[in-house]
Amino acid sequence: MAIEQALIDALGGYLNIVEVEPCTMRIRVQVKTQLAVDEAALRVDGVLAVVRSGDVVQIVCGANSDGIAAAMIASIQSVAHDTPVDALSQRAHA
């Protein structure tokens, strides 16, 4: 499994992700609920640290952060095109 898909799954899946934003050496992800986030599963190879605060999960991936964030956003956007319109209001927007 690609790192971006592992991170999406660990963040509670597509429906739990509100926003993905690359921030220098980390990926800032706003989630609907922290209860759906599996922090242990976020600690895959390539992840240096995980910081959780409020509805935000910051995933530190160093120099690879921008590329991983771009792959996560592309994956989320591709799902949006295959998701029924009524589900989009419940779905995350990246």
Segments predicted by a language model, with ranges:
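Soluble N-terminal domains of membrane-associated systems
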Residues: 1-94
